[in-house]
Curated annotation (Swiss-Prot):
This is Glycerol-3-phosphate dehydrogenase [NAD(P)+]. It comes from the Bacteria. The active site is at K177 (proton acceptor). It comes from Helicobacter acinonychis (strain Sheeba). Its main location: cytoplasm. The gene is gpsA. GO terms for cellular component: cytosol. It is found in: Cytoplasm. Its EC number is 1.1.1.94. NADPH binds at W11, R30, R31, K95, A127, R241, V265, E267.
């Protein structure tokens, strides 16, 4: 089976490596991936698998399955330019909310791909661990369970992929946990202790579920891998970009400096503002996201965390 992965960042390369164990994988990216792919291809070849090949867009569109790992803020433009077939089978691995239109990923994608041909990847995982072949469990959300299982069956031996419905719950959980992860990084950076951190994450999970339920997300999704699992991973590890943003803010660094030092996209920053605006529009109570938005705009980190712990 031939699979095309769109997106040459760390996440896109990790997914190309993962799917490469059982499948012929092409990767499409503007950047030259010759050097980043070398080690991954050596590992694949040692397993008897075919190496990942970087190809142009025209060649990439000839695959049977598509995996999209493009930053959410650029996803709509990417779909417009890529011109995927309307009936393409697509697994979207991007997590976040489009700030410009306050749109969820599924709302963006359905303008370009038949809804029954869409799947969304969720659950706790880091690119750095996937390329090491470390075990993890993920969820593929789709209204088309046959397609979700088709993608699940293409995953490697070290990934346990579950097929579930509840697209909206899965994508909101994946986006919202990045917001809570920033707050988790701040909490640890200020050395507020394990009790405060546990309170923050517990209330953060409740907040995620409350927001998701408004749009039809199911409670069990937020209590499973897509919600609690991804939250507890992302809010507790230095491998998380959003967690590292929180650590930087705890050092009283301006957000611009933190992001410059990070050198990578931390979706939680823009997702925070999108969530707060959506919550205001619909009257959803989101104390952690609301307080974090103030912190990102320059509020004192100590004052912000004190207010957050009291309100959450």
């Amino acid at each position: 089976m031939e699979i095309s992965v769109f997106g040459g960042g760390a996440w896109g390369r990790a997914l190309a490596f993962a799917f490469g164990e059982k499948n012929e994988v092409k990767i499409i990216s503007r950047r030259d991936l010759n050097e980043p792919l070398k080690k991954l291809n050596d590992a694949l070849i040692s397993k008897g698998s075919a190496p990942i090949e970087q190809v142009d867009l025209e060649t990439g569109l000839k695959a049977s399955l598509y995996v999209v790992a493009i930053s959410v803020q650029h996803l709509r433009e990417w779909f417009q330019n890529a011109s995927l077939p309307k009936n393409a089978k697509v697994l979207i691995a991007s997590k976040g909310i489009e700030v410009l239109n306050k749109a969820f990923v599924s709302e963006i994608a359905k303008d370009f791909i038949e809804p029954n041909h869409l799947c969304f990847l969720a659950g706790p995982s880091f690119a750095a661990e996937i390329i090491q072949g470390l075990p993890c469990a993920l969820v593929i959300h789709s209204n088309n369970q046959a397609l979700a299982l088709e993608f699940a069956n293409k995953t490697p031996s070290f990934i346990r992929a579950y097929a579930q419905q509840d697209i909206i719950g899965g994508e909101i959980a994946g986006a919202y946990k990045n917001v809570i992860a920033i707050a988790g990084g701040v909490c640890d950076g200020l050395k507020l202790g394990n009790s405060a951190k546990a309170s923050l994450l517990s209330r953060g999970l409740v907040e995620m579920q409350r927001f998701g339920a408004f749009f039809g997300g199911k409670t069990e999704t937020f209590l499973g891998l897509s919600g609690a699992g991804d939250l507890f991973l992302t809010a507790n590890s230095i491998l998380s970009r959003n967690y590292r943003v929180g650590l930087g803010l705890a050092q009283n660094k301006p957000l611009e400096v933190v992001l410059e030092e990070l050198g990578e996209v931390a979706e939680g920053v823009k997702t925070t503002n999108a969530i707060v605006e959506i919550a205001k529009k619909y009257g959803i109570y989101t104390p952690i996201a609301s307080e974090l938005a103030l912190l990102l705009k320059g509020k004192s980190v100590l004052e912000s965390m004190n207010d957050l712990i009291r309100r959450a």
